[in-house]
Amino acid sequence: MALRLFEHNEKAYHAAVRMMEQYGKAAIVHPTGTGKSYIAFKLIEDNPEKVVIWLSPSEYIFKTQLESLKRNDPDFPLANVHFYTYAKLMCCTQAQLDDIAAQEPAYIILDEFHRAGAECWGESTVALLKLCPEAKLLGLTATNIRYLDNNRDMAEELFDSRVASDMTLGEAVVRGILPAPNYVTTVYQYQKDLARYQTRVDNLRSAGIQDVNQKYLDALRRALEQADGLDKVFAHHITNKSGKYIVFCANKEHMDEMISHVPEWFAGVNPEVVV
C-alpha cells in the first residue's frame, strides 16, 4: 500500500526531491506534529532498492515513528534502512565509521538535524558525511536554529541553506494542520513581589504620590487574593488524570522547589500523584 502524504508534506517532499537532485541536499523545517517523518518514509518507499542511513537523536524517537508507520502500512519496506543515533556515531571508531560508510548509502536522513550541531555529535556526523560524498542528504527538524548556541543556523551549516520547505508553527495553526493551542495564564507565589512593591511605595518621598501608589497596590493585592490558585486552575483545565505534562523550570533549585508543591497543586487532578 503506497503512502499517501498530506498536501503540505507532499509539496515538501517533491520540493526536497528536486533540490536533492540539483544540489545533493535538502532540509525541511516544519513544526512538530506535522508528519515530517513521513516525508522521509516516502523517500524510502520510492527508492526501495537504495540503501538509506537514518540518523536520529534517540532510539525512542525512531521507534515511535516506526510504530506510526506500521499502523498505516504493516508491510512497509525497511530492509535497506540502517538506523543509528547521533550518540552511537560519537562512540564509533574510525574503522566503525568506515564500515557504516561501506554500505554505500544513496541517502542519509538527518532527523532533528539541529541536534547534530552539538559539539561531540556534530564532529562524528560530519565525519560520516565526508565518508559518503555520493549520498544525498535529507534533513528534518522543527527548528534549524540553535538558540542557546549563538543562534547557529544548522540549515546553513549542514545544507548550505538549501531549505526545500519552511513552515512556522503559526502558519501550521492558521492552515489547520495543527490545532490552535489553549493558553491559560495565572499567577502564583506573588507574596514576595507584593512585599517588594510595598517597600518601594514606602520609600516614596512624596506623600501624595505615595498615597496614589498605595491605592493601586492595595487594589492589586485584593485582585490577586481573589484569583484562583494553581490547584483550582489545574483541576479545571487538566481533565486527563493519566496524561503527560511538561513543566519548564529555570534551574535545578527551581525544579526542586516546584516539586515540593506538586501534592498541593495537583490535588484536584489526581490526589494519588507520586513525586
Regions found by a protein language model. Give the residues of each.
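Conserved pre-motif I regulatory segment
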Residues: M1-V29
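Hydrophobic residues on the short alpha-helix immediately C-terminal to a glycine-rich phosphate/catalytic loop
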Residues: A16, I39-N47, S124, L128
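Walker A/P-loop
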Residues: Q22-L43, F248
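Conserved RecA-like ASCE P-loop NTPase motor core of nucleic-acid helicases/translocases
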Residues: V51-S58, K244-N251, V274
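Inter-Walker segment of RecA-like/P-loop motor cores
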Residues: F62-E104
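SF2 helicase catalytic motif II
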Residues: Y86, D98-I145
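Interdomain helical connector at the RecA1-RecA2 junction of SF1/SF2 helicase-like NTPases
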Residues: D149-Y245
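Conserved helicase motor "Helicase C" RecA-like lobe of SF1/SF2 P-loop NTPases
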Residues: A250-V275
